[in-house]
Curated annotation (Swiss-Prot):
Keywords: Apoptosis, Membrane, Mitochondrion, Mitochondrion inner membrane, Transit peptide, Transmembrane, Transmembrane helix. Interacts with LETM1. Interacts with AFG3L2. It catalyses: Ca(2+)(in) + 2 H(+)(out) = Ca(2+)(out) + 2 H(+)(in); K(+)(in) + H(+)(out) = K(+)(out) + H(+)(in). Undergoes AFG3L2-mediated proteolytic degradation, upon hyperpolarization of mitochondria. It is a multi-pass membrane protein. InterPro entries: Bax_inhibitor_1-related, GHITM. This is Growth hormone-inducible transmembrane protein. The keyword Methyltransferase does not apply. It comes from Homo sapiens (Human). Belongs to the BI1 family. The keyword Transmembrane helix applies.
Amino acid sequence: MLAARLVCLRTLPSRVFHPAFTKASPVVKNSITKNQWLLTPSREYATKTRIGIRRGRTGQELKEAALEPSMEKIFKIDQMGRWFVAGGAAVGLGALCYYGLGLSNEIGAIEKAVIWPQYVKDRIHSTYMYLAGSIGLTALSAIAISRTPVLMNFMMRGSWVTIGVTFAAMVGAGMLVRSIPYDQSPGPKHLAWLLHSGVMGAVVAPLTILGGPLLIRAAWYTAGIVGGLSTVAMCAPSEKFLNMGAPLGVGLGLVFVSSLGSMFLPPTTVAGATLYSVAMYGGLVLFSMFLLYDTQKVIKRAEVSPMYGVQKYDPINSMLSIYMDTLNIFMRVATMLATGGNRKK
């Protein structure tokens, strides 16, 4: 499941930002290309209209319709995706009000925090401290790579070599940091943690082409989303979202396939724009739900892990899922802000 999240994270900049310089984005209206499509007559449908032939579409026609550039259809697909995100935001806001105001009859984690032992509070505190540290190190790594032309050019290529190398680095760094025990080898564990954050910074580095002001806005929006959803997870019943594992796995598979499929289809086609919207907007809602799930999972793990057990509580491993959710949300919010701004021009 973690590998699928990495693919969803890695394919986003390679598919959205790099091709933006070579071909139109599905939501950025290129006036020259648009006028060319609008002014070029479709001989096939014009001929069929003149001779009055009415018959069902064949498989070839359906394929051509899916791969045909149509800015009007692409715009509608993008709008549907944005409305889907807006609906998810409304549901999240309603859940925040419902659980935050104490309207639920069940006891949430925030009520249980009063009777938590001190070691449970320390575990959760250290987990979120490492999360904040990972985000800060990732930002510093992204800035450093953006100011290194050789590394930045490599990350911006979007070739299969670049994707393969970065994906291998992400998986390798993730496996390394998870495999080292926190209590027995604190030094190597923290070095692996630094390496993992640096590698993820390289993945985020292509976002710097969007500019500092937009990324700061995206960071604030992401902080609001993460803070609001974390509050919902804390106020909701302690196992309310832990039962969403199977549906979230299905949704992750759908976003995973859409992310891979969007790499092979041009974003200016109906099929490519549909896959892009599923990976972008569906992914934003999906990883927001994952954040609810992972937050309650961290709390549950901090509560049930024995203090003197054989396997000690690992705050670094515990925060990795929330960290990946946060990065996926941030990259999609930044992309939505960028494409939304370009669409208004």
